[in-house]
Every structure is written in C-alpha cells, then in structure tokens.
Amino acid sequence: MIASYHRPTTALVHLDRIKFNIEQVQHHIPKSAKTFAVVKANAYGHGAVQVAQAIQKQVDGFCVSNLDEALELRQAGLNDFILILGVLLPEEVALAKKENITITVADLDWFDKVQTENIDLAGLSVHVKVDSGMGRIGVRSTAEANQLIAGLQKAGATVNGIFTHFATADEASTVKFSQQLEMFTTLISQLDYKPQTVHASNSATSIWHSDTVMNAVRLGIVMYGLNPSGNALELPYEVKPALELTSALVQVKEVQAGDTVGYGATYTASQAEIIGTVPVGYADGWTRDLQGFHVLVNGHYCEIVGRVSMDQITIRLPKAYPLGTKVTLIGQDGHETISATDVAEKRETINYEVLCLISDRVPRKYDKKFS
C-alpha cells in the first residue's frame, strides 16, 4: 500500500519521547541489564528503521518478529545485535547467518528437520526459547533444553542466549506470573550449559516486576509511551505517547433534521447540524467499530456519526470550522487528549492493536528534536 502524502492524514512520531521512555525504564532496572528494543511490526506502527536509528546508542540491540524485519534494519545500515523472536524456516537459516542475525530455536523437531536437510549451522548465533506457560513456541523441560543446546553446539552453532515470555505480567494477579518465573528459573539452574544472555522481561515485567529482571529486558509497548495493561494497572512513572494521528476537515456542510449520513443511513440528524468530513477510514486502520467514538477539533470532542468508510469519516461539529482545520484522532488538542488506549477501550481491544493497525497509507513524519 502506497503512502498517501497528498492528503492531510499523517502520523507524527516524536522520537525524543521514545528516547525518554527508554531512559525511564532503564532508571528502574539493574544497570547491568541489557536493553533490547522491540521494533517488530514496523516498531508497533512507528517506523522500524527511523526508531532504531534514533535509539541505536541507547540500547544493546533490537528484537523483530521475522527475517524480513531483520533484513530491513540491516539494509538501512544498522549493524547492531538483532534477535528474531519468531521461528525461521530451515531454508532461511543461511541468510540469517550471512547477515549476522541471531535466530530463535524453539524445539527439537525444528533442529531435527534442519539436520535432516543438512543445513549448515556452523557460526549461527542462537537464542533458545523456553515455553514457561505461554503455550506458544519453546521447549518445555530442562531435558529438552539441554538436549537442544547440546545438539546446536555440536552442529557448530553458538548458543548466546535463552529466554521466555510471560503471559500475565500486565495483570494484577501474580499467580500465573509466579508459576512461569519459577519454571524458568528452575530450568536455568539445571542447565548443563548456561548461555550468556538470559532474558524474560517484556515491558510489563520491566515495569511491575523489575526485581525479577535477569540480565536483559525486551522493551516493546512502553517504549512507545503506552501502558502495557491498558488502564488495568497504574504506571509507577511517567511515559510519553510517541505517536499522534491527525487529519483535517475537507468539507463542512449543514444537514437538516431527518437527513441521514453515511453507508446504511445509520445516522439521522435530529435537528440542523454541522457535519465535517475527514479523509481517514478503515483502510488507514481507523476501523468501522469507531462509529460513535470521537475526535478532537479545536479542543472540542466531536462525535463520529455515520459509518466509518474505507477512506472517510463524518463528524458532528459544534460550529462551521474552516476547511483545513486540524482534526486529532490520537493525541492532544488544547486541554483534551485522545490516547491509543482510549481508542482501544472503545474497540474492546488493546492499545498495541490500535497502533499496529495504522496502515502504510498513513505517512509517518518524525519530530527529530531530542530533549
């Protein structure tokens, strides 16, 4: 999807806020702990290359989801440590090794398949994934971990790290978290060979369970200034949302009582009303279930009336504003703010999804001033 620069809908990313957020977390974890910045999914919609370049000196490496995301960073000239968190196909190993990209190995079946296909692992950098209770990828016992590490080393791979992922670190109850932590720490203590880097802390763990940080953290959503729990848990320190989503009024008209607006004629004006049209829609990630939500115009909340279309929304205005007047979908206008978490609550989802769904059609612009 091509970025649409010739319309007013834009995502502005404040790189200085991302740097600030990283510093906030780093101040509250052990100084010896490495920081891996998670820039998968285009840095949660913020722009992977631009974010990585801005924070390169602040972190110890980057985490991505797949080989293509890792190659994007390499092709942009970023030669830092990169860990692919997902599982690679065996035929992708050679390219990862060539580009000095660390891969995740998550079970013996994958290793056996690689061996059967005679894929050369010599010189490959590996982190082993442990499934401590998430139920996705990873080894589930000390015996399996020991066998996998020994096999990888015999094949010439370098096992530099081992890690797990917590399912409920962003929840008030710590029962499941404690079970996972105990499983992982017990497994680590029983390894025949302990890799140098041991990491389990995602954003939520780094914030609310900082005393359990091992020797590295993986910072994702908090780096972009959002609460991993939504609003379920209070943040112990300030972080600043890094992304603003704005557009502008392209038409303003008066409709009369009884007039309908949008597909399906789902909205009927109860009296004479001023309706503004904004060029943003579900193709941009502003989804159809946001009908009835609001945006900000000149510091005023304005309801989205009628269905969200592919390319446009219609909003009820308190008065007839000039064409080109700024419309804030995510961000601050005057004394009022709409956060990605607010949008998520309306959609009954999580703030991660709201950011990741902002499509490539929305140009990203960058405020590069650093405070």
From Swiss-Prot:
One Pfam family hit: Ala_racemase_N
Keyword Isomerase: yes
UniProt xrefs under SMART domains: Ala_racemase_C
Keywords: Isomerase, Pyridoxal phosphate
BP term (GO), one: D-alanine biosynthetic process
Pathway: Amino-acid biosynthesis; D-alanine biosynthesis; D-alanine from L-alanine: step 1/1
Residues bound to substrate: R136, M310
Key word DNA repair present: no
Alphabetical list of Gene3D superfamilies matching this protein: Alanine racemase (3.20.20.10), Lyase, Ornithine Decarboxylase, Chain A, domain 1 (2.40.37.10)
Reaction(s) the record says it catalyses: L-alanine = D-alanine
One CC-aspect GO term: cytosol
InterPro entries, per database record: Ala_racemase, Ala_racemase/Decarboxylase_C, Ala_racemase_C, Ala_racemase_N, Ala_racemase_pyridoxalP-BS, PLP-binding_barrel
Top-level division of the source organism's lineage: Bacteria
Function noted in UniProt: Catalyzes the interconversion of L-alanine and D-alanine. May also act on other amino acids.
Listed NCBIfam families: alr (TIGR00492)
PANTHER family (alphabetical): ALANINE RACEMASE (PTHR30511), ALANINE RACEMASE, CATABOLIC-RELATED (PTHR30511:SF0)
Record-given protein name: Alanine racemase
Lineage, uppermost ranks: Bacteria, Bacillati, Bacillota, Bacilli, Lactobacillales
